[in-house]
Amino acid sequence: MARGLETFLAVLVLGAATAPGAADPLLREFAVCAGRLSATMEDQWMFDGPASERTAEELSAVVSLIEASMPQGSGRQVMAWRIDAKVAQKGLLQQARFARDARLAETAAARAEALAAECRAMILS
């Protein structure tokens, strides 16, 4: 099965198995940031190795925040949020790298960086 299809099906199954809004909004933000940073790190593995190490540390910090704030039984919802955010961030990064339209590529790169920067700022504050 294609990797993208596996991810889509996982999101679909996890989303159907959990109630929306089942957790704290801050926990959701942590999970979304974990997904974004994970996609960013994977992109950096291919194109900017040294930056991936810094992103891995940031991801580790966010995962620690998730573990500290996640109530028992909310793991599926948290994973669904992470996967959704990772897929979205990965899409932006792919557009930034491979779009034939330069304006689209620039816009996608700026948006991907802005979203990752929001997560980094949350860790530092």
Labelled PLM ranges:
Residues 9-14:
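Hydrophobic helical h-region of N-terminal Sec-dependent signal peptides
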Residues 24-79:
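Short N-proximal segments of mature Sec-exported proteins
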Residues 1-8:
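Bacterial N-terminal signal peptides that target proteins for export
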Residues 22-26, 47, 104-107, 111:
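Non-transmembrane, amphipathic alpha-helical segments
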Residues 17-20:
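N-terminal signal peptide c-region/cleavage motif recognized by signal peptidases
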Residues 57-125:
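Compact alpha-helical subdomains of small soluble proteins
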Residues 15, 38-39, 124:
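Charged, amphipathic alpha-helical interaction segments
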